[in-house]
Amino acid sequence: MMKLLFIIISIIFVINVSNSTPTLQLSGYFNVNETTNANLFYLFYESQNSPSTDPLILWLTGGPGCSSLMAAFYENGPYFVNDNLTLSENPNSWNMVANVLYVDSPLGAGFSYVVDSDGYSTTETEISENLYSFLTQFLSKYPKYSKLPLYIFGESYAGHYVPSFSYYIYQKNLGLATINLKGLAIGNGMVDPYIQYGSLGPFAYAHGMLDINALKETEGLYESCQQAIDSGDYNMTTQICNNIMDIVQEYAGNFNVYDVSKTCYPNEPLCYNFTAIIDYLNLASTKQSFGVLPNSTWNVCSTQPYSAIIRDWFNTPINYIPTLLENYKVLVYNGNYDWICNFLGSTEWTSQLKWKYNQEFNNSPRKILYINGNTISGYSQSYDNLTMQVLLGASHMAPREAPVAALAMVESFIQN
């Protein structure tokens, strides 16, 4: 009986949104490790366009240890949560153009759980193994989605997850191509700290948050940060590299590290007010409809998976990306207001990629992007399988502030 509980699936139609077309929703758990009793939770929304032919997007939120449901109800899902805990329709939901599968990963994030504490993931390989087990079970349970083009999207620390999981699928497909992976996308991602930490000072300086002396101070700290990363001493590296962040915040004040156009207030976790989402997802009725264990508590981010994987922070999956570019499309995008994983850092690591079209990509012309005819929404640079986009007016969670531009970007990427 207990084992059946681990794979319970809840199939419902969302009907409590006025003037909304019901969308097929699937949710529940798949057991990915019987030994540790490890269970990944998912929430799936079928495409509102052409579910039988539209691609499948698998979404991963970073942290590490933050729930993908945060994206589902705050960024790019079909519904937002109102202050009175009702739902309102998102006209720019990504399931307007794709089937979207949100997965709470790694184990312990969101509604996902593991009974044996030894089951928490400590490496990207373990996370990828669990995700692969989950995905193969999902596609087996729902075979009508198994042949659709698959795109893996992720945000923030998912800059580690997305390339690692994509490369894991690539390796598995060398034997027999069972998963129809076509591309991957990294939004405001932390991919290579060795490179990206160097952008924190210059970005703040360019936004008027630092003077020239403070900038020079961050440059000296960045050199020490790189040396610490090279040493392999995690504790020392964390302390030294975090000094860059501390110095910038000391000079610039209590700004929102995810959106430099805003102030971060002490009573807001992660600088945002997620109270309505937290309350909604912890309602007994919500948990019942999702097929979630009644005693589960949903949090935006969880400490146990964070503590388990955090020593992997300064490792980088960047060496996987040249191989991935040989086989799949890769999209890297950033909101221009994000500081913590900013576009300068993304531009730098993409420009340094060791792949055959490095020079051609770096020399390719940048295009201006428009929405609504003549409104500038961002900028794009592309060559062969690699595309880099900057979305104007957007933060760390780019689809929230630039929903129209983000949806257009996704549609262009997955529909060729």
From Swiss-Prot:
Domain of life of the organism in this record?
Eukaryota
Q: What is one Pfam family matched by this protein? A: Peptidase_S10
What are the GO cellular component annotations?
Answer: extracellular region
Record bears the keyword Glycoprotein: yes
Keywords annotated in UniProt: Carboxypeptidase, Glycoprotein, Hydrolase, Protease, Secreted, Signal, Zymogen
- Which terms under GO biological process does the entry name? proteolysis
Main location as per UniProt: secreted
The record's GO molecular-function terms, alphabetically, read:
serine-type carboxypeptidase activity
Sugar attachment sites are 33, 84, 235, 273, 295, 385
User: What are the EC numbers?
Assistant: 3.4.16.-
Asked whether the UniProt record includes Protease among its keywords, one would answer yes
Identify the stretch annotated as signal peptide in this record. 1-20
Q: Which Gene3D superfamilies match?
A: alpha/beta hydrolase
Which sequence ranges are marked TM in the entry? Answer: none
Active-site residues? Answer: 156, 338, 396
Q: Which family does it belong to?
A: Belongs to the peptidase S10 family.
Task: Describe the task this protein carries out.
Answer: Probable carboxypeptidase.
Q: Which PANTHER family match?
A: SERINE CARBOXYPEPTIDASE CTSA-4.1 (PTHR11802:SF113), SERINE PROTEASE FAMILY S10 SERINE CARBOXYPEPTIDASE (PTHR11802)
What's the protein called, per UniProt? Serine carboxypeptidase S10 family member 1
The record lists the organism as: Dictyostelium discoideum (Social amoeba)
